[in-house]
Curated annotation (Swiss-Prot):
Keywords: Malaria, Membrane, Signal, Sporozoite, Transmembrane, Transmembrane helix. It comes from Plasmodium falciparum. Residues 114-130 have a biased composition (Low complexity). The chain crosses the membrane at residues 80-101. Residues 120-137 are annotated as: Epitope (deduced). Residues 137-162 have a biased composition (Polar residues). Residues 1-22 form the signal peptide. This is Malaria protein EXP-1. Its main location: membrane. Changing D136G: In Ag5.1 negative strains. GO terms for cellular component: membrane; symbiont-containing vacuole membrane. Residues 109-162 are annotated as: Disordered. The gene is EXP-1. It is found in: Parasitophorous vacuole membrane. This protein is addressed to a new compartment within the cytoplasm of the infected red cell. It also surrounds the parasite, probably in the parasitophorous vacuole membrane.
Length: 162
């Protein structure tokens, strides 16, 4: 322990002496004195060039104003694009909903309107609703009564029995 303390004390004195010797040599040669200290003692010029600082501040302020203008243009453009994206997504979601609804009902995917079975069964209903009566309505017996299957009815499969 005593050896370590002696060793550290010797190192401390060596470092301290080097610094003190360096200061003494700088004072003698005059090379250790900074230029700011020379200006203070010698002439009446200020240490800081105020005109350069003011011109730098003005340039930075102009750059900030320019950046803010660009940011405002980008902000407007992004808000317009966001609005358009909202409209497009709304239209797409509505179209997907319409297609899903119509396919579930068994209609054409893009049909808009009522889903009356009478409209789907009678394609001539559109012409009658327009005020154009059919000149030759030909109704046959097959149109009125559906065909009955011929043969044994026991071969037909019914749901609750099987």
């Amino acid at each position: 322990m005593k050896i370590l303390s002696v060793f550290f004390l010797v190192l401390f004195f060596i470092i301290f002496n080097k610094e003190s010797l360096a200061e003494k040599t700088n004072k003698e040669t005059g090379s250790g004195v900074s230029s700011k200290k020379k200006n203070k003692k010698g002439s009446g010029e200020p240490l800081i060039d105020v005109h350069d600082l003011i011109s730098d501040m003005i340039k930075k302020e102009e750059e900030l104003v320019e950046v803010n203008k660009r940011k405002s243009k980008y902000k407007l453009a992004t808000s317009v694009l966001a609005g358009l994206l909202g409209v497009v997504s709304t239209v797409l979601l509505g179209g997907v909903g319409l297609v899903l609804y119509n396919t579930e009902k068994g209609r054409h995917p893009f049909k808009i309107g009522s889903s009356d079975p009478a409209d789907n069964a009678n394609p001539d209903a559109d012409s009658e609703s327009n005020g154009e009566p059919n000149a030759d309505p030909q109704v046959t017996a097959q149109d009125v009564t559906p065909e009955q299957p011929q043969g044994d009815d026991n071969n037909l499969v019914s749901g609750p029995e099987h």
